[in-house]
């Protein structure tokens, strides 16, 4: 697969649409110009389920891949290689690239090259006040006066050419913010279960969950706790459901929460969120919040787009 992608139009994917992301071996070699965002790409790929290694000498790539794939069973690997690798390794990239494809298959190995326009790179280095790798003479950080920044950027293009010419995908980050970069990478590599909705019932008397994205207080609803025959039951029991059936406000509140979540949860997906936690709280976390959490799970699972997972947990279950 050879796709050079510098525009926003086409969006090549590294996986077959009919194949599960987790079932396919995906070895992604990520290289590119200093300041173009290669490290950000590796961090995003790690968030997307890749085992990421940055600044790996090219000569060690075959050994690292073999250990990760054969010894650890890891199937999604992103290896960052850049100008800091020994120069002899760069000239030997073709042989390393071919050996990986022979060992793991043509479709398993992809080279991604990250770049940016020269004026963008200069602006980024000036903004961060970092020194270009080719302007550093030794490990003490002494600046190499043989290169100014534009010259170092131009020289790096020449040195990385052995990798660049094998690029299956090129990403120009000049006009991309971090959110757009995330979206682009998600399109390239594919993501199983792109977002998980975690519904959590809890009791306010034991404290509010600190990791919730949304918290709904349902203590205004009728409380089965005050019915002696229902005190030992929970919101998962049929008799509690029958109790709530006599109160239309319970159905109305459940519907209102579902409407709100159906409206806004898809936006979290487009904002590159992987999980969203929705907490439903009553006094003790046994009746009202449990009942609504269970019914919300059923409602959302049927109404949200396919591929989203809705889970339900009850924080106070050990207290029942």
UniProtKB/Swiss-Prot annotation:
One of its GO terms (molecular function) is ATP binding. The keyword Metal-binding does not apply. Keywords: ATP-binding, GTP-binding, Nucleotide-binding. InterPro entries: P-loop_NTPase, RapZ-like, RapZ-like_N, RapZ_C. GTP binds at residues 82-85. Transmembrane segments: none annotated. ATP binds at residues 32-39. The keyword Transcription regulation does not apply. Signal peptide: none annotated. Belongs to the RapZ-like family. Displays ATPase and GTPase activities. NCBIfam families: PRK05416.1. This is Nucleotide-binding protein Psyc_0118. It comes from Psychrobacter arcticus (strain DSM 17307 / VKM B-2377 / 273-4).
